[in-house]
Amino acid sequence: MSSVKRSLNQEIISQFHYSAAEGDIAKLTAILSHSPSLLNETSENGWSALICDRSIVNKSRQTALDIAKFWGYKHIANLLANAKGGKKPWFLTNEVEECENYFSKTLLDRKSEKRNNSDWLLAKESHPATVYILFSDLNPLVTLGGNKESFQQPEVRLCQLNYTDIKDYLAQPEKITLIFLGVELEMKKEFFNYAGEISKEEEDGLVAWFALGIDTVAAEEFKQRHENCYFLHPPMPALLQLKEKEAGVVAQARSVLAWHSRYKFCPTCGNATKIEEGGYKRVCLKEDCPSLHGVHNTSYPRVDPVVIMQVIHPDGTKCLLGRQKRFPPGMFTCLAGFIEPGETIEDAVRREVEEESGVKVGHVQYVSCQPWPMPSSLMIGCLAVAVSTEIKVDKNEIEDARWFTREQVVDVLTKGKQQAFFVPPSRAIAHQLIKHWIGMNPNL
């Protein structure tokens, strides 16, 4: 008898939920007039008539959104698809430890307060201890370090030049781009005497670094005189060969040099501009230009924010990875895209994932970021939890997208290219996001 009563009760709950999904107000009112407690009754999936956890999946691995789409409940599907945030899934950690990605570490203190001190900058330009790094077409000058007789892979190191090496270029300011990068983090208590060139009163113990951009003709002439040096090219993946702290310096220099190469003329009026503030500002030469009054972002180096996200299946056991046509065969990575004006990080993640893969995203959690000097992006790394699972790739955006199991991803990270697919190298934030997801499992 009790089982019959239970079945009848379940049938009433089922009818009530069906009416709620249909939006049948009249029937809902009639049912509630007899059994108001049904408002709090939940189905086998844990859903009530008023709310549902979008991250819960049934035995067929379907979410509430998947089911609404399957049965054609467009109004419900629209509500579920466009609801933001939601309850944090159980498989996401409460705290995310701060980490430094490649291109994030540096040897330098930027000393931005010195950029307006033209006398100090001029003195540092000719200081014997000052370090210059040379660029041509945004490619840094490097050399191979280590013992030539060693069987180990030689290190790619920046060529650290001094004033004597580059003074001829400084004499032709119209042909170069000079950027003050900062000073070494460790102050030098005492410099060598340098034959008495610098008085003790003038010495501050700060070792300044500058980036110097020269044209291709000058670059070829320099290489002929310094056969052990070469310009690192192409930027990807060549820049990933640098030591971590030197890579951070290159990221800073390359991004600012790229900005100068693209903004030689005033974005406000179109007239020519000149470089000021140690290379961190371009000033219009037209006296009545509006950009000369107040602070304008067009006068300073720009950074383009990009979201890059590890999309996790609603049940936490799979991740979504995609690939573009230009990728090496077999490489899959996290989805990514530029943030649009007036858009939050979370909304950008949801929009980009849906545009590229057709998958809807609910909860978004920030993990870490990475400067990406191609030419000047900031990759904002996030975890994103899907609320739908069906993939519909936009071929105009990406070539393919797939769900990969945790086991597949672990095999790729541990066995590399022996597998059917591979992911970006460890110095890319995509790799670190994938590892972060894998690391959520305490058994790994």
Swiss-Prot record:
Location of this chain's protein in the cell: Cytoplasm; Peroxisome; Cytoplasmic granule
Keyword RNA-binding: no
ANK repeats: 11-40, 60-80
Upper taxonomic lineage: Eukaryota, Metazoa, Chordata, Craniata, Vertebrata
Chain positions recorded as Mg(2+) 1 binding sites: 336, 356, 397
Modification type N6-succinyllysine: residues: 167, 274
Cofactor note: Binds 3 Mg(2+) ions per subunit.
Motif range (Microbody targeting signal): 442-444
InterPro entries: Ankyrin_rpt-contain_sf, NAD-cap_RNA_hydrolase_NudC, NADH_PPase-like_N, NudC-like_C, NUDIX_hydrolase-like_dom_sf, NUDIX_hydrolase_CS, NUDIX_hydrolase_dom, Znr_NADH_PPase
Binding site for Mg(2+) 2: 352
UniProt entry tagged with the keyword Plastid: no
Keyword terms: ANK repeat, Cytoplasm, Hydrolase, Magnesium, Metal-binding, NAD, NADP, Peroxisome, Repeat, Zinc
Disulfide bonds: none
UniProt-annotated binding residues for substrate: 300, 336-338, 352, 356, 397
Assembly and binders: Homodimer. Homodimerization is essential for its catalytic activity and protein stability. Interacts (via ANK repeats) with BLMH.
Main location: cytoplasm
Function as written in the Swiss-Prot or TrEMBL entry: mRNA decapping enzyme that specifically removes the nicotinamide adenine dinucleotide (NAD) cap from a subset of mRNAs by hydrolyzing the diphosphate linkage to produce nicotinamide mononucleotide (NMN) and 5' monophosphate mRNA. The NAD-cap is present at the 5'-end of some RNAs; in contrast to the canonical N7 methylguanosine (m7G) cap, the NAD cap promotes mRNA decay. Preferentially acts on NAD-capped transcripts in response to nutrient stress. Also acts on free nicotinamide adenine dinucleotide molecules: hydrolyzes NAD(H) into NMN(H) and AMP, and NADPH into NMNH and 2',5'-ADP.
Designated name of the protein: NAD-capped RNA hydrolase NUDT12
GO cellular component: peroxisome
Top class in the EC scheme: hydrolase
SUPFAM superfamilies named among the record's database cross-references: Ankyrin repeat (SSF48403), Nudix (SSF55811)
Family per record: Belongs to the Nudix hydrolase family. NudC subfamily.
Cofactor: Mg(2+); Zn(2+)
Domain Nudix hydrolase: 301-435
Catalytic activity annotation: a 5'-end NAD(+)-phospho-ribonucleoside in mRNA + H2O = a 5'-end phospho-adenosine-phospho-ribonucleoside in mRNA + beta-nicotinamide D-ribonucleotide + 2 H(+); NAD(+) + H2O = beta-nicotinamide D-ribonucleotide + AMP + 2 H(+); NADH + H2O = reduced beta-nicotinamide D-ribonucleotide + AMP + 2 H(+); NADPH + H2O = reduced beta-nicotinamide D-ribonucleotide + adenosine 2',5'-bisphosphate + 2 H(+)
Renumbered ranges of motif Nudix box: 337-358
